[in-house]
């Protein structure tokens, strides 16, 4: 297959022996990114004279799909990804061959800036490329194609030329880093027992965002038979085959393209119940005209967590959602595994002490609450570092399970499936790399031993040596594509024993991972997200007059039919607790300020400052004891009132004395998604957590929210310092999603902002006695700064209807009577975007602190997508499209 470019009225053509496929972006502007796909005969194509042969005449392998991208000049462009070279690495039986991707080019359908390098062949020292046919004769043609490519290459000078920087060079680097493998058929991602009706194949397809529209169009328009090798699918992972005498051993590891994160540091699941670091590894033995296959999977603990690093405390586990809020998606994760593999045998390798202990306990708790018998056997196992080769404990523990699970066996001669694997081991440690790979190797060794026992063949030392190298290479490869460094423990697996050199290598790798964990590779993660189409402004390229483009048009026209609007109510409260915990009665007054007449709200957002006493011992301590007390008390009050309205904690966060918790009706917790949280220190120039902000972002249905709890600098004259702290938080508080506070639609910002009433103490106290709130507000520093536009841009505050909330003598209703005689002030405030309708804004008479808590209630409209209605519209549109096409024939 060869590739041609037409510069005028730009289009790209793929040429086979009989047909030409032409891809072009129309000049007519459209709201969607649409291209045309035309299939003509070779004779028709040869009549068109404007096309120029690309890549020095070298044959290409096919396309990985179409990509829509906004270039540096802010012009939106469509790029076609062409796979130019791949190295054949594995072919077994009648399975489609797997080749390692080595060279790709992105051809612009809009601009000619990068055209010159498209006319150059690959460097002369390129290794042979592969083809993707399944016949022996075509495999023999590989060498002929390589000779042709060499002839073309020799015609060109090898001198280096400088080309303009390509907008998609980061994707080129990613796709050719040695971890991507391609095939023409998605079935290469199936396990060997592909006849079994399970396994969602697309989770391993890394170019699904680029190729899905072409896949669908080829199927609907019956183009596939004309261009069987044009569309390529790629997965990321590691593939290797080793030959030993008359047998071979192979390993195919496929990294899932779904999950909360594909790079280091590790994390848990996403809102679709896919976990990060999920890898399916198939161990294949080919001997005596028979193929044996055994599959294992690895993946992080499937609840909402992430690993964090602190200069004070080192690594720690942060849970993004409460255990209760995580359980439903934890269950869904295991139900999908059960559907794909059958019985799930969980092997947990987490440490029971140290910072991993909290994650170990959470995993154990979630597994106990699984509502179905998907997990046949679950146990915790700690690998023995002195026995990297084989651990007798593991063999004893797994003997019955391996016998029950079995393995897949298939005859190459008659292509008959003789047995298949029943169930799968799901293995995890913190990052599912070093420890997990060692255990997977040990299990594969037990499987190999069983296979050879049934064949009545002895396992030789040579075979075990190859097996160790195979799994060590696999561990290193998977670890490198995720962390940039090899697998810890791989040298011990390779040698079958620990060594000084191996220990030093592991120490070096540990430091490498520590660095990557502390300073994540944002560029690599962004390149991955770009490839997968995960950024909010990314949309797939559609083909004109395809069913997909037709359906998108119908969905736009009928959007109001499946977009549902609903009323949503929020109760918010902020309280500087001065290190105190309110009594049960005070908690009731805080959350039910109108007693039994208080409405039940959909969402409760509680912000606390000085949840602990701000002394040095508390600031350097990582204890979350007070946080747990507040969470439990809040839930107790909310759930004791009405049996029909039960609440659960969605997420909470604490940074020293600053706390924020979000609670929602249990009936609504499944519509919450994209929950992340973050902090920003502002104390002592950003080094101390005694002042600063914590924030939680989340989606409720299709509406996004950002909740912030802040504590600013004290003292009446520190206005500029408070303004700077606001700027520091608004500019530098960044969520893991990359969003800042003002990137959200619905913002609720609460806290002890410490802005004071800037007037004489005696006058202020007299105005307080007269209840002259308007006059007091005219002296309020925050009102003044907001009018100037200095702080809280775009946020508004309800009218102040309550007396100043600071500073009181503890346990009394008297303003400060100490020698300092602080001026009464509204330090505690709640601000929101205009999307909120403000219903009530008051303070509570709770006297355990020198502040009074403030609460505000809001209502707003949120939107959700009715998936059943949307699916019905899509189904009707598809039927209408097919009828229209049939009537035009």
From Swiss-Prot:
Induction or repression: By stress.
Cofactors, names only: Mg(2+)
InterPro entries, per the entry: Endo/exonu/phosph_ase_sf, IP5, IPPc, SAC_dom
E.C. number(s) listed in UniProt: 3.1.3.36
Intracellular or extracellular location(s): Cytoplasm
Keywords per UniProt: Cytoplasm, Hydrolase, Lipid metabolism, Protein transport, Transport
UniProt superkingdom: Eukaryota
Catalytic activity: a 1,2-diacyl-sn-glycero-3-phospho-(1D-myo-inositol-4,5-bisphosphate) + H2O = a 1,2-diacyl-sn-glycero-3-phospho-(1D-myo-inositol 4-phosphate) + phosphate
Keyword Transport among UniProt keywords: yes
SAC domain residues: 171-484
A molecular function (GO) term: phosphatidylinositol-3,5-bisphosphate 5-phosphatase activity
Protein's GO biological process: phosphatidylinositol dephosphorylation; protein transport
Gene Ontology cellular component terms for the protein in this record: cytoplasm; membrane
Similarity-based family: Belongs to the synaptojanin family.
Known function: Controls the cellular levels and subcellular distribution of phosphatidylinositol 3-phosphate and phosphatidylinositol 4,5-bisphosphate. Involved in distinct membrane trafficking and signal transduction pathways. Highly active against a range of soluble and lipid inositol phosphates. Active in dephosphorylating the 5-position of Ins(1,4,5)P3 and Ins(1,3,4,5)P4 and to a lesser extent Ins(1,4,5,6)P4.
Name of the protein this chain belongs to: Inositol-1,4,5-trisphosphate 5-phosphatase 2
Organism: Schizosaccharomyces pombe (strain 972 / ATCC 24843)
């Amino acid at each position: 297959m060869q590739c041609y470019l037409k510069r005028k009225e730009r289009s790209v053509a793929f040429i086979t022996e009989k047909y030409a496929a032409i891809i072009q972006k129309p000049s007519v502007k459209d709201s969607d990114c649409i291209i045309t796909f035309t299939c003509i005969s070779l004779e028709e194509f040869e009549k068109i004279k404007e096309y120029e042969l690309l890549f020095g005449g070298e044959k290409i392998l096919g396309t990985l799909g179409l990509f829509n991208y906004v270039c540096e000049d802010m012009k939106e462009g469509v790029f076609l990804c062409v796979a130019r070279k791949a190295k054949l690495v594995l072919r077994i039986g009648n399975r489609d061959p797997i080749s390692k991707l080595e060279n790709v080019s992105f051809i612009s359908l809009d601009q000619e800036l990068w055209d010159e390098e498209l006319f150059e062949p690959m460097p002369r020292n390129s290794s042979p490329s592969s083809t993707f046919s399944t016949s022996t004769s075509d495999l023999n043609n590989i060498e002929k194609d390589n000779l042709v490519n060499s002839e073309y290459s020799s015609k060109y000078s090898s001198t280096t030329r400088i080309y303009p920087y390509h907008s998609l060079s980061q994707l080129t680097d990613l796709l050719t880093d040695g971890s991507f493998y391609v095939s023409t058929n998605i079935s290469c991602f199936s396990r060997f027992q592909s006849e079994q009706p399970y396994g969602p194949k697309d989770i391993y397809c890394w170019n699904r965002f680029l190729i899905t529209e072409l896949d669908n169009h080829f199927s609907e328009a019956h183009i596939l038979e004309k261009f069987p090798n044009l569309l390529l699918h790629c997965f990321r992972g590691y593939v290797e085959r080793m030959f030993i005498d008359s047998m071979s051993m192979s390993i195919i590891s496929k990294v899932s393209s779904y999950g909360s994160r594909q790079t280091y540091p590790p994390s848990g699941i996403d809102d679709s119940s896919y976990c990060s670091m999920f890898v399916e590894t198939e161990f294949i033995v080919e001997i005596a005209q028979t193929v044996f296959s055994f599959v294992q999977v690895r993946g992080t603990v499937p609840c909402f967590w992430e690993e964090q690093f602190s200069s004070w405390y080192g690594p720690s586990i942060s849970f993004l959602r409460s255990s209760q809020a995580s359980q439903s998606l934890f269950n869904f994760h295991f139900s999908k595994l059960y559907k794909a593999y059958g019985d799930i045998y969980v092997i947990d390798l987490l440490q029971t002490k140290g910072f991993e202990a909290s994650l170990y306990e959470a995993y154990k708790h979630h597994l106990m609450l699984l509502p179905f018998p998907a997990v046949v056997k679950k146990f915790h196992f700690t690998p023995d570092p002195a026995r990297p080769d084989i651990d007798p404990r593991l063999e004893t523990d797994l003997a019955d399970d391996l016998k029950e699970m079995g393995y897949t066996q298939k005859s190459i001669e008659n292509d008959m499936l003789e047995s298949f694997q029943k169930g799968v081991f799901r293995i995890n440690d913190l990052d599912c790399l070093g420890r997990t790979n060692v255990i997977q190797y040990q299990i594969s060794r037990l499987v190999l031993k069983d296979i050879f026992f049934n064949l009545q063949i002895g396992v030789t030392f040579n075979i075990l040596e190859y097996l160790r190298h195979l799994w060590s290479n696999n561990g290193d490869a998977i670890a490198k594509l995720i962390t940039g460094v090899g697998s810890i423990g791989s040298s011990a697996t390779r040698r079958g024993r620990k060594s000084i050199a191996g220990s030093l290598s592991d120490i070096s790798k540990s430091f490498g991972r520590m660095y990557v964990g502390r300073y994540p590779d944002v560029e690599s993660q962004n390149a991955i997200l770009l490839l997968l189409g995960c950024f909010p402004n990314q949309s797939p390229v559609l083909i004109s007059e395809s069913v997909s483009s037709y359906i998108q048009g119908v969905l736009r026209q009928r959007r109001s039919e499946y977009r549902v609007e609903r009323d949503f109510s929020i109760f918010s409260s902020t309280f500087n607790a001065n290190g105190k915990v309110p009594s049960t009665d005070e908690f009731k007054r805080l959350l039910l300020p109108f007693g039994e007449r208080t409405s039940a709200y959909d969402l409760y957002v509680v912000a606390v400052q000085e949840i602990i006493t701000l002394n040095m011992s508390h600031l350097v301590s990582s204890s979350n004891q007070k946080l747990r007390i507040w969470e439990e008390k809040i839930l107790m009050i909310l759930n004791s009132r009405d049996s029909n309205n039960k609440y659960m904690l969605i997420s909470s966060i604490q940074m020293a004395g600053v706390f924020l918790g979000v609670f929602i009706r249990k009936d609504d917790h499944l519509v919450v998604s994209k929950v992340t949280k973050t902090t920003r220190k502002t104390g002592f120039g950003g080094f101390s957590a005694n002042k600063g902000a914590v924030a939680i972002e989340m989606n409720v249905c299709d509406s996004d929210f950002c909740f912030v709890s802040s504590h600013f600098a004290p003292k009446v004259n520190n206005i500029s310092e408070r303004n700077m702290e606001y700027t520091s938080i608004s500019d530098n508080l960044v969520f893991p999603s990359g969003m800042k506070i003002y990137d959200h639609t619905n913002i609720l910002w609460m806290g002890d902002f410490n802005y004071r009433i800037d007037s004489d103490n005696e006058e202020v106290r007299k105005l307080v006695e007269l209840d002259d709130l308007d006059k007091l507000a005219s002296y309020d520093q925050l009102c003044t700064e907001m009018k100037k536009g200095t702080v809280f841009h775009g946020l508004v505050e309800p009218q102040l209807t309550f007396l100043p909330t600071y500073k009181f003598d503890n346990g009394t209703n008297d303003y400060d009577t100490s020698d300092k005689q602080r001026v009464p002030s509204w330090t505690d405030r709640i601000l929101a975007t205009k999307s909120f309708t403000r219903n009530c804004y008051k303070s509570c008479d709770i006297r355990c602190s020198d502040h009074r808590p403030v609460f505000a209630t809001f209502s707003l409209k949120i939107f959700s997508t009715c998936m059943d209605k949307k699916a019905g519209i899509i189904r009707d549109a598809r039927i209408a499209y097919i009828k229209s096409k049939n009537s035009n024939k």
